[in-house]
Amino acid sequence: MTRNWSFRVIFVSAMWCALLKFATLEAPKDDFEYDGGCPFVVLDNGTHVKPAGCSHLCNGAPETLDNIECYNVTEEVAKRMTPGIPYACWLGWCSKGECKRDNRTEVCYRGSEEE
């Protein structure tokens, strides 16, 4: 009988603790402004997108990317590409805001503005 009583006390205590924990949790506050900032221009290769270059100005301040694959194309050139037309783009790797070109190319596309 004592064993059954001990189990009930432990079970009720555990349930009470769980109830208190979940009853006091608040939803996290999301203070991030998703409409701010300046997104990088990206080009598509049919399965993935990569940034065109690794740096740009955002509200007068430089923004850079690091340690990510990129296309060795300036944002200005990428913006002038005709959407949906295949281009041969040099691949590179972002290092301190510069897209360091390697010896590979792949087909890339500029997406439409609606995407």
Curated annotation (Swiss-Prot):
Glycans are attached at residues 45, 72, 103. Residues 1-25 form the signal peptide. One of its GO terms (molecular function) is C-C chemokine binding. GO terms for cellular component: extracellular region. It is found in: Secreted. The keyword Transcription does not apply. Disulfide bonds join 38-58, 54-94, 70-99, 89-108. InterPro entries: EVA_Class_A. Gene3D superfamilies: 2.30.130.100. Keywords: Disulfide bond, Glycoprotein, Secreted, Signal. Pfam families: EVA_Class_A (PF19429). It comes from the Eukaryota. Salivary chemokine-binding protein which binds to host chemokine CCL2. This is Evasin P1183. The lineage of its organism: Eukaryota, Metazoa, Ecdysozoa, Arthropoda, Chelicerata.
